[in-house]
A protein has these predicted regions:
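Acidic catalytic/metal-coordinating carboxylates
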Residues: 38, 62-65
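A short, hydrophobic beta-strand element within the central beta-sheet of small alpha/beta folds
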Residues: 55, 76-86
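Acidic, metal-coordinating helix/loop segments flanking the phosphotransfer/catalytic sites
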Residues: 32-51
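Conserved small/polar residues in nucleotide/adenosyl-binding loops
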Residues: 94-96
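Active-site residues of response regulator receiver
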Residues: 7, 55-56
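The feature encodes the CheY-like receiver
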Residues: 59
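Short amphipathic alpha-helix used as the core "switch/output" element in two-component signaling
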Residues: 64-75
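Two-component/phosphorelay signaling modules centered on CheY-like receiver
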Residues: 9-34
Length: 96
């Protein structure tokens, strides 16, 4: 499975990557992981990926724009939105 991780916080990128590598060792899943530190570097590439972990708030191109781009390349992609901003959590809880 191809997995993309995009976050401007490199600690978060490493934590997600380590989690996936550990999961890969404990199961039959084999992850091919590609990491980016900003959305700008993704928009000019034709990356087809099965799963993506994307920070919603990054300098330059934000996570929503990256998600839309990746969905044009693979409409079946599964995207996990990552954020450390409390405001986004508050907004999402309103809709539960």
């Amino acid at each position: 499975m191809n997995v993309l991780i995009c976050d401007d916080d490199l600690k978060i990128v490493q934590q997600i990557k380590n989690f996936l590598l550990k999961l890969s060792k404990q199961s039959t899943y084999n992850f091919d992981i590609t990491c980016f530190s900003n959305g700008d570097s993704i928009l000019d590439k034709q990356i087809k990926t099965d799963f993506a972990f994307i920070d919603i708030e990054m300098p330059g191109v934000n996570g929503l724009s990256v998600t839309k781009h990746l969905q044009t390349l693979n409409p079946n992609i599964i995207v996990f939105i990552v954020t450390s901003f409390q405001g986004y959590l508050d907004l999402s809880l309103i809709h539960i």
